[in-house]
Amino acid sequence: NGVSRTPMPTDAGNFGLLDRRVAAEVARLLDRVPTSTPLELRDRALFELAYSSGLRAEELVSLDVASVDYDDEQVRVEGKGGKTRIVPIGEHALSALRAYAERARPALSPTRSGAATSGGGEPALFLSKSGRRLSTSDVRRRLRVWARHAAVQAGASPHWLRHSFATHLLEGGADLRAIQELLGHASLSTTQVYTQVESARLRTVYSRSHPRA
């Protein structure tokens, strides 16, 4: 996934400000993706899901239509090493996915230049304008487009959304073991990079709360 471009807090007093700023940038990026055309609906669903469920770019493009369980509000993800995990889908992402599935995906999969039809066999959830499965480079390119449109300052990438997902879960009270499972990390040690965030948060709480801090 590369190195995260979301800056880690270096000053405990700045942690709350940093977390709010990153959350605001993510929200602004997602909200600035229009929903007027099939490609816009696709992109909105793609990036809402990336942030809602913390998926890697490779995992996003490998999703099939059947991967999404709308009734149970979850997605089945084939992660690294062929390991499968079930991840919840948030309300905003689920709404965006429904809009994409109903209004956009059929329009992206007509028989055109050999592209598969929606009923003819292309199982991919996210389709290109030619009706084929998106590539990871497509995902990164489209995210850069919308990041510029939203004037997002941080280096926007799929991993930036994934890192923000984990950071905001930790800030909201989730424990590392739960985050490990949601991210699909094989080892807890991989997830422990987020202890830097937790340490900064605890230091902020301590500094604000202890009379002799």
Enumerate the predicted regions with their spans.
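Conserved catalytic core of the tyrosine transesterase superfamily
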Residues: 1-213
